[in-house]
Amino acid sequence: LDITLENTTNKGRIDMAVRFNGNIYLFEFKVVEMVSEGKALLQLQSRGYAEKYRQFGEPIHLIGVEFSKDDRNIVAFDVESI
């Protein structure tokens, strides 16, 4: 198990990267007003955060989590495996 927080790339910072059991999980966390905006997963995709981890040859899972500012609860949890 290897966990890295605020992992820097040439295009920004990955909120959390986890290498576990032959898989890589990249997390982006966003706070939104009320409803899901899809920005967390979109940031992982558009900034190419997975490129830093392709060298390991392991499955990579992009996980976008959005929290409601008012409810302080998860309003979206999007996953894409690449």
Where are the regions a protein language model picked out?
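Structural beta-strand/beta-sheet cores of well-ordered domains, especially the beta-sheet scaffolds
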Residues: 12-14, 25, 58, 63
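Conserved catalytic cores of phosphodiester-cleaving nucleases, focusing on short active-site segments
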Residues: 16-18, 22-33, 47
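C-terminal, active-site-flanking charged/polar segments
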Residues: 22-24, 37, 45-46, 75, ...
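Domain-level recognition of nuclease-like catalytic cores that cleave nucleotide substrates
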Residues: 52, 56-82
